[in-house]
Amino acid sequence: MNLRPLHDRVIVKRVENETKTASGIVIPDSAAEKPDQGEVLAVGPGKKNDKGELGAMAVKVGDRVLFGKYSGQTVKVDGDELLVMKEEDLFAVVEK
């Protein structure tokens, strides 16, 4: 199933954090924190300004982004857990 977000929303798939520390200690799932990074899978057309014009989105499909641990609404699509959130809930784009 393909999702097309509306307005200034983006669809993000969480990128799992390392389950092992730098010293080699394995972190159990129960102690691991929710990842706060993800890959943008889909981007809406943008938010309308006061004149009714669409503002350009600052992120694009494929961008790796940072967001709050509790940001967005979780949805399950074809067995994958995805996040739907507004662009303003994103903190930054991770540059490679």
From Swiss-Prot:
Q: Which Gene Ontology terms cover its molecular function?
A: ATP binding; metal ion binding; protein folding chaperone; protein-folding chaperone binding; unfolded protein binding
Question: What SUPFAM superfamilies would the database entry show?
Answer: GroES-like
What is one cellular component GO term in this UniProt entry?
Answer: cytoplasm
Gene3D superfamilies named among the record's database cross-references: GroES chaperonin (2.30.33.40)
Query: Could you give a single Gene Ontology term from the biological process aspect?
Result: chaperone cofactor-dependent protein refolding
Entry's localization field? Cytoplasm
- Please name the InterPro entries in this protein's record: Chaperonin_GroES, Chaperonin_GroES_sf, Chaprnonin_Cpn10_CS, GroES-like_sf
One Pfam family from the record: Cpn10
For this UniProt record, the keywords arranged alphabetically read as follows: Chaperone, Cytoplasm
Q: What is its main location?
A: cytoplasm
Q: Name the domain of life this protein comes from.
A: Bacteria
The answer to whether UniProt assigns keyword Amino-acid biosynthesis to this entry is: no
What is stated as this protein's family in its record? Belongs to the GroES chaperonin family.
Query: What is known about what this protein does?
Result: Together with the chaperonin GroEL, plays an essential role in assisting protein folding. The GroEL-GroES system forms a nano-cage that allows encapsulation of the non-native substrate proteins and provides a physical environment optimized to promote and accelerate protein folding. GroES binds to the apical surface of the GroEL ring, thereby capping the opening of the GroEL channel.
Per UniProt, subunit arrangement is: Heptamer of 7 subunits arranged in a ring. Interacts with the chaperonin GroEL.
The molecule here is called Co-chaperonin GroES
What gene makes this protein?
groES
